From Swiss-Prot:
Protein name, UniProt field: Protein TIC 22, chloroplastic
Membrane topology: Peripheral membrane protein
Keywords linked to the UniProt accession: Chloroplast, Membrane, Plastid, Protein transport, Transit peptide, Transport
Locations listed in the record: Plastid, Chloroplast intermembrane space
Length: 252
């Protein structure tokens, strides 16, 4: 039984999310275990002694996508204890309304945050560079996209750990002798792009062209992969942004 004199904000917010999204059967504490279907089309034989992708390269692939967190009056991240209370982490929400809910939890439990705490956006490339510096974060995905991921993973619909990302080989772009593979945080955005490039992708068959994986797992694959392995081709498309517009900005 939880003590009435202590508050574990990670556990408290996890219960809040589960209360509103209990059908998704996922818990915030379980996102340490990275799972999900890998985007296997990018796995190739790795050359010996090849250089791995640099943090700047990985960060560039993440540019443009914003997440939301809570900061105090000094614009510092409001950190939470992990499930064991061993370390502090920052919570990053893919939906602003989830960050607002977290802010309400913080204000109700911590008097010092009632006046100056606020929700602030931060881009994923900035988050990644902070991670490189040793700051720990936990992502809270969009529950709609969790539902989409579970529907695509027909063989295992029990749970999905991490942030879902979606990809299709039909949308690979080749320009300036380079290959770019867009990865989406929104299944709906991917379906819209597929509807423009392939007649066969319309209607019921659209899911046949879509692969789903965990953002955290894909990110780890990028960090551990060498150049020319295929993982350096990935470009993450911000939710709601047009595929062509973002690719032009990245390629420029």
């Amino acid at each position: 039984m939880e003590s009435q004199g202590q508050w574990n904000p990670l556990l408290s917010f996890s219960r809040f999310i589960n209360h509103h999204s209990n059908h998704l059967a996922t818990r915030l504490e379980e996102t340490k275990r990275l799972a999900g279907t890998l985007i296997q089309s990018h796995t190739r034989t790795k050359p010996a002694f090849a250089a791995t992708l640099t943090p700047n390269h990985v960060a560039k692939s993440l540019a443009g996508t914003s997440v939301y967190t809570v900061s105090n009056s000094d614009n510092e991240f409001v950190l939470m204890s992990d499930a064991e209370g061993a370390k502090s982490i920052g919570l990053l929400c893919f939906r602003q309304e989830d960050a607002e809910a977290f802010l309400a939890q913080v204000r109700s439990r911590k008097k010092e945050f009632r006046g100056g705490a606020k929700v602030v956006p931060i881009t994923l490339d900035q988050v990644y560079m902070l991670k490189v510096e040793g700051i720990a974060f936990r992502f809270l995905p969009d529950p709609v996209q969790i539902k989409n991921a579970l529907e695509l993973r027909a063989a295992n619909r029990g749970s999905f750990d991490g942030v879902p990302v979606f990809q299709s080989d039909l949308l690979v772009v080749k320009k300036k002798n380079k290959r770019y593979c867009p990865v989406y945080f929104s299944k709906e955005d991917l379906e819209y792009e597929l509807s423009k490039v392939s007649r066969s992708s319309k209607g019921v068959g659209v899911s046949q062209h879509i692969m789903v994986g965990s953002f955290e797992d894909v990110l780890k694959k990028m960090e551990l992969s060498e150049k020319s392995s295929g993982w350096e081709d990935l470009v993450f498309i911000p939710p709601g942004k047009k595929h062509s517009q973002h690719m032009q900005e990245v390629i420029a």
